Design a protein with these regions (language model features):
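Conserved short alpha-helical segments that host acidic/polar catalytic motifs at enzyme active sites
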Residues: 3-221
């Protein structure tokens, strides 16, 4: 699985980036690897990805907006308790307000990015009952700005959630496996069957299918 993630990231190298990272869920543990510079640095750090074990995960290449091009600022970002990992494209306009609120509640930040507020909001709203959709909806309700988000939760190993507002996000539908990306280029070697999310939509993606919801949580298709 990690080979497909890394291959997808390599297909997006043409867009330019300053760091790369990958997170996979191995049982109930999220494994994380990040590196500055080219994807080959991430490959070297993980022995071509063989150090990563799992069957569900996400990856990202970052072009710095908020925060310098450092390993700490590279995506994915992980919650303090290790339950959530996320990647995001876009800009969260109210991130400083959210950051100050979360810090006041005791959440520890390890980066300068606007993205990290999202993973801590997920942690704050999650009740531990496996209801990831409600957690995501509450989190999205606090965000102002544009985003395309991928969310991995250690308590929900059979699903991932996606959310789009103003930035491209695409589901790739395979046979017994599904994918997501911000650019169809990362998907075409695995599937030609793709679904483009609309603004305000979120999606639950599983190996056996997917469900798209509107901003209220009502199924769309």
């Amino acid at each position: 699985m990690y080979k497909r993630q890394l291959e997808g990231l390599q297909k997006l190298e043409y867009r330019g980036y300053d760091s790369a990272g990958i997170a996979v869920l191995d049982g109930s543990t999220i494994e994380l690897a990040k590196a500055c510079g080219e994807i080959k640095n991430l490959l070297a750090k993980t022995h071509d990805g063989s150090d990563l074990h799992g069957y569900i995960g996400l990856g990202h290449t970052r072009w710095a907006t908020h925060g310098a091009p450092t390993e700490a600022n590279a995506h994915p970002h992980v919650s303090n308790d290790g339950k959530f990992a996320i990647v995001q494209n876009g800009i969260i306009e109210n991130f400083m307000e959210l950051r100050e609120m979360l810090q006041a509640k005791g959440f520890r930040f390890h980066s300068e990015t606007d993205t990290e507020v999202i993973v801590h909001l997920l942690d704050m709203y999650y009740t531990g009952d496996g209801n990831l959709k409600d957690t995501v909806l509450k989190t999205l309700g606090r965000l102002e700005g544009s985003y395309a988000i991928g969310i991995l939760c250690a308590d929900c190993p059979e699903q991932m959630f996606l959310a789009r507002n103003g930035c491209p996000l695409i589901i790739g539908v395979g046979a017994g496996e599904n994918f997501f990306a911000s650019d169809v280029t990362a998907l075409v070697s695995h599937t030609k069957n793709v679904v483009y999310l609309d603004d305000g939509e979120l999606a639950e993606v599983r190996a056996d299918g997917y469900t798209v919801f509107d901003c209220t949580g009502k199924p769309v298709h």
